[in-house]
Swiss-Prot record:
Biological source species: Dictyostelium discoideum
Source taxonomy: Eukaryota, Amoebozoa, Evosea, Eumycetozoa, Dictyostelia
Signal peptide start-end: 1-26
Keyword Metal-binding set for record: yes
One term of GO molecular function: hydrolase activity, acting on glycosyl bonds
Disulfide bonds: C56-C78, C429-C442
Protein name per Swiss-Prot or TrEMBL: Sphingomyelinase phosphodiesterase C
Binding site for Zn(2+) 1: D39, H41, D107, H289
Keywords, in A-Z order: Disulfide bond, Glycoprotein, Glycosidase, Hydrolase, Metal-binding, Secreted, Signal, Zinc
Length: 446
């Protein structure tokens, strides 16, 4: 009898254990997700009926009686209206209410001249956006970066301590550690250990921006690159995986035909990552308002021998549809991006690019957000690793229809006039050659 009871218990244990193992094996780990918010440029003085030639901030005779004023939804010559801003956050919450965290890469104030701004207005813009994100995503970790418009005068950010770093550090103190607050006060940069084995480094790339005159005579503003090297070295010793985030990306801006960084900073910045490409998963930036990516190498000469890249940068499009009327660039439709990553390896798996057609919205009177494309489907890749994105680049390079579609997505499906040979060269070379020398050689080769 005792033997029979023991046998019964043993069989029950085997059955339960088998069921447990089968369930464990059959149920895959859920992938992590995060929103990337960038270049919102909310204009709190945007008014319905405003004159687009006056940034939609005032009603004029022309806007009232002749040409017609701006829609309450938005205008391609103006920054983000409240209606557009509100709809974007409502859509994000509806689509993915509980992301693991939010990456927010700056540029909150509207595109205004210094005569229309001051320190108080700039800080109020950053405060408004901070409160908005926290309000829609309470208890969700936020990892921010400072942008070139998050300053006064515009684009001018020098070494701290200064009014900007001091005030923003206090504003962001609820989601930054004490160590992060200290380095932010010094230079607007920091690092956070998100979880065991997973680190985010937020860099202040405005130091190197081509319109920032405050750091031209400095070799390493606020010691950021030295600190970066030490942080990456420690991360490597600890066996951590690293993500790099910032506002202004290095390399060539295909929209404005200019390098984003001052010449002396561009290559030095890229070289800072070469020794640690084995632990850096990817970079995320904003600033250009366009949808694109950048490949880079440990050695800038590696592209000559078709060696596969060791790094990848993703540039997300802006929420603002604003068009620079003084430079040869198209506007873009508003965009939002949701990334997907492996919660074990912290590798980037995919992203979902959402958009809204501002032209149609103005006609209908409703804002309709929808999926524009899924990255792995459009690029025909398994994931978003540097090697996979190199394959995506080769597809764009070799298949004309893919290039034209990529160029269309570059401005978030805003109608373009196509992409001629010069356009093709700039698009392809800016993707593959963020180093200055390689880019110039590429323009001749293609």
């Amino acid at each position: 009898m005792k033997f029979r009871n023991n046998l019964t218990l043993y069989l029950i244990f085997i059955i339960v254990f088998t069921i447990y193992i089968s369930l464990t094996i059959s149920i895959p780990l859920k992938n992590g997700k995060f929103w990337h918010i960038t270049d919102t440029h909310y204009d709190f003085m945007y008014i319905e009926g405003g004159d687009e030639d006056k940034q939609c901030r005032e009603v004029t005779y022309k806007s009232k009686y002749e040409k017609g004023g701006a829609s309450s939804i938005g205008n391609y010559k103006c920054d983000t209206s409240f209606e557009l801003l509100q709809s974007s956050f409502e859509y994000m919450v509806k689509h993915e209410e509980k992301p693991d965290f939010i990456i927010w890469t700056g540029d909150d104030p509207p595109h205004l001249g210094n005569s229309q701004l001051n320190e108080t207005l700039v800080l109020q813009s950053i405060t408004n956006m901070t409160n908005l994100i926290k309000g829609y995503f309470p208890d969700i970790p936020i990892f921010p970066s400072i942008g070139n418009h998050d300053s006064y005068p515009q684009h001018q950010i020098g070494v701290g301590p200064n009014w900007l770093f001091e005030n923003v550090a206090q504003l962001w103190s609820p989601f930054l550690s004490n160590d992060s607050i200290e380095t932010f006060k010094l230079g607007g940069y920091y690092t956070e250990l998100v979880s065991e084995g997973f680190r985010i480094i937020s860099l202040n790339t405005v130091f190197y921006y081509n319109e920032n005159r405050q750091c031209l005579n400095l070799t390493d503003p606020a010691g950021q690159l030295l600190w970066l090297n030490e942080t990456l070295a420690n991360a490597s010793l600890a066996g951590e995986r690293v993500w790099i985030i910032g506002h202004v990306p290095p390399g060539y801006n295909e929209k404005y035909d200019v390098f984003n960084f001052h010449k002396q900073f561009n290559d030095e910045y890229l070289f800072s990552f070469s020794q640690y490409s084995d632990i850096i998963e990817f970079h995320i930036y904003g600033h250009e308002h366009t949808d694109t990516f950048r490949l880079f190498y440990d050695d800038p000469n590696d592209h000559i021998n078709d060696i596969e890249p060791t790094g990848i940068m993703f540039l997300s499009p802006s929420l603002t549809p604003w068009m620079n009327q003084f430079l040869p660039a198209l506007p873009n439709n508003p965009g939002l991006r949701l990334y997907e990553y492996n919660i074990t390896s912290f590798a980037l798996l995919d992203y979902y690019q959402f958009w809204t057609n501002l032209t149609d919205n103005i006609i209908s009177g409703n804002i309709d957000w929808q999926l524009e494309y899924r990255a792995t489907e459009f690029f025909n890749t398994f994931n978003l690793s540097p090697v996979s994105m190199y394959e995506a680049y080769l597809l764009i390079q070799s298949v004309t229809s893919q290039l034209l579609k990529f160029h269309f997505y570059n401005s978030v499906s805003y109608p373009t006039k196509g992409c001629d040979e010069i356009c093709k060269k700039i698009q392809l070379c800016s993707i593959r050659h963020p180093f200055t020398k390689g880019f110039k050689e590429c323009l001749v080769e293609i």
